[in-house]
A protein has these predicted regions:
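Short amphipathic, helix-prone segments within low-complexity/disordered or flexible regions
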Residues: 3-7
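Short, Lys/Arg-enriched N-terminal segments with co-localized hydrophobic residues
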Residues: 8-18
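PLP-dependent amino-acid enzyme catalytic core
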Residues: 18-408
Length: 408
């Protein structure tokens, strides 16, 4: 995987014009374009991840900042013209998105930074960011006439999918590694999912899930395989911009596992830039555990992603073979951002630190983003006039054992 040497402030996502808002894909790896009906998940030529292409001229006619200002639909679906769903498609009834952004003036003053914002996606229905892509995946599965939908997950993606499926009466089958936190597995079972415990890593659970979906014809939601997960995740970027009065932050800190949240946020900001809703793009700062750092190493190094073992307390980013690595590395490098590695000790320390400074209770992976933010602050790498946003992707009750360890 090679990160491009493209200009810093323009996205790598293709901007071709098509008859419908979203009518084609482009492979992120080899560049081949596909019509929507031509492929279902990945590139037919190289197996690479696909990017959804939009007709931005058409979007501009359907979506405006003024229209959003009077729109009472405070969910991710308020941005429907920038989502790849049919106009007539019903969406899950759970309220996904429009999670709060907190302005942390006291924290900013103490750290000597202009503004610090916390976006708390732990406030979503199943308590994580992953409700966004799972809600969209359920819509696409129903459009395809699927009855069963599956995903591989360390917990949050599975919980999100299970909750969305329960809300519309669909069956879900979730593949999870044996080390997944008990609270997350319990959440799957509460929602009525069929849970397949894999005695192995997340990467092994992922491969088994893909093989099972091919064999049995289940609809596949897994990150870095289903191209629509990125589209659901980008809605957080739309909200960040709108909630900050269309003045994008200078830097966005986000924890990175497979890389799909990173690539989704970057695409979302680029979408808004393309339709003239924002006039500048933020720098994307990816944070990983030092024991699961394939994307950070590539972004800060030669651009090549090298797989390796992953062993971190932050289960949601415990990934040795990131499935959306190319797009994530590009997002960091094109935005002029960087990668940050943090230790498990720093991640654990960030859980109570974030809670005591802001009142936001984060699971380990979400706290990793805050740990990365603190690390750059302490290193003097942030400017006094920076406006910084930290993306909190999951609630601390998702992994209560780690929370207990963090305060011992």
């Amino acid at each position: 995987v090679t990160a491009p040497s493209a200009e810093k402030k323009t996205g790598s996502f293709e901007r071709r014009i098509y008859m419908n808002n979203s009518a084609a894909f482009k492979c992120i790896e080899c560049g081949r374009e596909h019509h929507v009906g031509e492929v279902e998940y990945v590139c037919a030529s190289c197996g690479g991840n696909l990017d959804v292409l939009y007709d931005y001229g058409r979007v501009r006619k359907q979506l405006s900042r003024e229209g959003l200002a009077t729109d009472g639909n405070f969910t991710m679906w308020r941005y429907r013209p920038l989502l790849p769903v049919e106009d007539s498609s019903p969406v899950p009834p759970l309220t996904v998105g429009w999670t709060p952004i907190y302005t942390c003036s006291q924290l900013a003053g103490r750290l000597g930074i202009k503004e610090v914002f916390i976006k708390d996606d732990g406030r979503n229905p199943t308590a994580s960011f992953k409700d966004r892509p799972s809600a969209l995946a359920v819509v696409k599965a129903r459009e395809a006439g699927a009855r069963i939908i599956t995903t591989a997950s360390s917990g949050n993606a599975g919980s999100a999918l299970a909750g969305m499926c329960a809300s519309v009466g669909m069956r879900s089958i979730i593949f999870v590694p044996a080390y997944a936190p008990a609270a997350k597995v319990a959440q799957l079972q509460i929602y009525g999912s069929t849970v397949v415990i894999v005695e192995g890593s997340y990467d092994q659970a992922y491969d088994l899930c893909i093989e099972a979906s091919r064999r049995f014809g289940w609809y596949q939601r897994s990150t870095g395989y289903n191209p629509y997960t990125r589209e659901g995740k980008k809605t957080a970027a739309f909200e960040i911009a709108e909630q900050l009065d269309w003045d994008a932050p200078d830097k966005v800190f986000v924890a990175v596992g497979d890389g799909n949240i990173m690539s989704g946020l970057w695409k979302g900001f680029n979408d808004l830039y393309r339709i003239g809703f924002i006039d500048r793009l933020p720098q994307m700062i990816g944070v990983q555990s030092e024991t699961a750092s394939a994307i950070v190493d590539a972004a800060n190094g030669d651009g090549f992603v090298r797989e390796g073992p992953a062993h971190t307390i932050a289960d949601s980013i415990n990934v040795g073979r990131p499935r959306d690595a190319t797009a994530a590395v590009r997002a960091i490098r094109e935005s002029g951002g960087c990668g940050v590695e943090v230790s498990d000790e720093q991640i654990l320390a960030a859980i109570p630190a974030l809670a005591r400074e802001t009142g936001v209770f984060a699971e380990p992976a979400a706290a990793a983003a805050y740990a990365g933010f603190l690390k750059l602050c302490q290193a003097g790498s942030l400017k006094h006039d920076d406006r910084v946003l930290v993306m909190v992707t999951g609630n601390g009750l998702k992994d209560i054992d780690s929370a207990r360890r963090s305060v011992k």
